[in-house]
Amino acid sequence: MKSDKELFGLAQMYVTLENEYRKASEYGLDELGEIKEGLENIRDTLFQKGYDIDKFLRYQEMYLTMSIGEYAKFIKTLE
């Protein structure tokens, strides 16, 4: 389960950074390079550790659609 917990955490971070990247692009903010580097680091980690990319994408979708209660229950299953 540790790898699932880490993979879900990476999916959360990726979704958050993607949203920040969109906002930074829209408003022309200086953080674009740092955010892009963060996204690349997550992608590198996924491949270096051999994570299941389909599962990563499912976790991203879950994170985007979960209610707070569903999120809390899911996190407990990963512990």
Each model region followed by its residue ranges:
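Glycine-centered signal
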Residues: 1-2, 14, 57, 69
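Short intrinsically disordered terminal tails
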Residues: 1-5, 73-79
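N-terminal acidic leader/helix
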Residues: 2-28
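Acidic, low-complexity, intrinsically disordered interaction modules
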Residues: 19, 23-72
